Amino acid sequence: MGQYNKELHEKYEFRNIRRDEIEQAVKIEAICFPPNEACTYEHMAPRIENAPDLFLVAVDRKTRKMAAFLNGLATNREHLTDDFFTDADQHDPAGTNIMLLGLDVLPEHQHQGLARELMEQYRKENRLREERS
């Protein structure tokens, strides 16, 4: 298990994405991935609509802009297949497995442990989710 990173939590707010942040997420995706791999608005919006609780963002407290995000879908399937990336209807809120679909950190926010902290926060949230179900 990771340790709580106080410095990162002072610099960034970790929370679930809001619907009004879809455009920001799509822009970050376009920066972090080549065009043939980047998730488009057409596929990102349904992910956020279907599983906002599985879309964690890190927001820079000074600029109030998204710096990074991690997202996934829940399922009872055991293997990640290509259709998860293009069909958010694969999400099953009662699913016992989480398929991680993207981890994006803007270049200017890299190399300070932000991706690791997103993964740790995501893991904690999903452990709580499991306990509630």
Q: At which residue positions do the language-model features occur?
A:
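Hydrophobic adenine-recognition pocket in adenosine-nucleotide-binding enzymes
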Residues: 17, 103-105
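A short beta-loop-alpha structural element at the N-terminal edge
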Residues: 11-25
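Short acidic N-proximal helix/loop "leader" segments that mark the beginning
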Residues: 1-7
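Helix-loop element at the rim of GNAT/NAT acetyltransferase active sites that forms part
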Residues: 16, 27-40
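Conserved GNAT acetyl-CoA-binding A-motif
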Residues: 98, 119, 126-133
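Active-site rim helix/loop that mediates acceptor-substrate recognition in acyltransferases
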Residues: 34-62, 71-80, 84-90
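Conserved G/P- and acidic residue-centered "switch" motifs that form tight phosphate/ATP-binding loops
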Residues: 113
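Conserved acyl-donor/pantetheine-binding loop and adjacent beta-alpha core of acyl/acetyltransferases
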Residues: 65, 69-103, 110, 120
